[in-house]
């Protein structure tokens, strides 16, 4: 009996020793990698970088400030138009001569009374940044021009925009035309771009490298320079985008890019030069690439 008790005590002691001498498992601390934010070319620039699928914001600077969006507002015009028109709808051009800036004026000018398929009109507005085509979308809309502008502002609010206030479909800003309230923050533009990218047709158009009007082969257009392999601004990550410029807005650029299998939206407003929009966009894409790789 004593022998059994002694054996039991010995076993218990050995087990206790084994437990106390076992080294605790050390948990490896996850290394925190600090990625420096890029220094952009212009101090007053407004910029946002957003994931097109999740809405996650990777970078923001002056993102809530109201700015003039120039022709980037045509992304919002496209959202309204794509829900109303069909590809084979023929639209009639009106009031073309009222535009102070006409992009087709030197190559195959647009005149009042032309009948142009919606497919040509939407491509012309997004790829050529044609103010004539933006005006045509508004003039043929239900409720006419004013109805289109109202629909743009309503759609912006529905998306969640808080600083959008548009008075025309093309983004021009002229005091004598009453076009000085055309405002939008870069945060709002990123939300518009995100909503835009959800639409399969618009996504295809914005990623088209070049397009020729079916109704007039002399009207040809190309996407932003960052998609052109022969351009000094070429970046293989960039799928497509929308440029913008007025004296009040400065240089603006919205792009869609693929970074680490994610679709990334970049928005820059109020740059001094076209070159700055491209170089800052590249810096922002490099920054997101480093963040996703960390």
Task: Annotate each language-model stretch with its function.
Residues 24-187, 197:
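Active-site-adjacent loops and short helices of periplasmic peptidoglycan-processing enzymes
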Residues 1-7:
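Bacterial N-terminal signal peptides that target proteins for export
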Residues 7-8, 149:
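Hydrophobic face of alpha-helices
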Residues 17-18:
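C-terminal motif of bacterial Sec signal peptides marking the signal peptidase cleavage site
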Residues 31-44, 143-294:
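Penicillin-recognizing serine hydrolase domain
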Residues 21:
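Short, conserved catalytic or interaction motifs in soluble domains
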């Amino acid at each position: 009996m004593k022998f059994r008790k002694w054996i039991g005590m010995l076993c218990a002691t050995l087990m206790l020793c084994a437990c106390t001498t076992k080294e605790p498992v050390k948990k490896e601390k996850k290394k925190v990698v600090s990625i420096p934010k890029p220094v952009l070319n212009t101090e007053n620039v407004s910029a946002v970088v957003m994931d097109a699928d999740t809405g996650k914001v990777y970078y923001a600077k002056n993102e809530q400030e109201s700015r003039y969006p120039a022709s980037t507002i045509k992304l919002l015009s496209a959202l309204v138009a794509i829900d109303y028109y069909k590809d084979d709808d023929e639209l009639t051009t009106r009031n073309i001569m009222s535009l102070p800036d006409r992009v087709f004026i030197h190559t195959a000018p647009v005149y009042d009374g032309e009948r142009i398929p919606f497919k040509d009109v939407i491509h012309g507005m997004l790829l050529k940044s044609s103010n004539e085509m933006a005006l045509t979308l508004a003039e043929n809309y239900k409720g006419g021009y004013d109805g289109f502008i109202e629909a743009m502002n309503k759609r912006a609010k529905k998306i969640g925009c808080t600083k959008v206030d548009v008075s025309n479909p093309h983004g021009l800003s002229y005091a004598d035309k009453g076009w000085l309230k055309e405002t939008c923050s870069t945060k709002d533009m990123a939300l518009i771009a995100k909503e835009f990218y959800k639409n399969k047709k618009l996504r295809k158009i914005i990623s088209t490298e070049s397009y020729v009007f079916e109704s007039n082969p002399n009207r040809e257009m190309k996407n932003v320079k960052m998609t052109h392999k022969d351009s000094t601004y070429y970046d293989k990550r960039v799928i497509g985008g929308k440029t913008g410029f007025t004296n009040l807005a400065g240089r603006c650029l919205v792009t869609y890019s693929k970074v680490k299998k994610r679709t990334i939206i970049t928005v820059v407003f109020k740059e001094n030069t076209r070159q700055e929009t491209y170089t800052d966009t590249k810096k922002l894409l490099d920054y997101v690439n480093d963040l996703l790789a960390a």
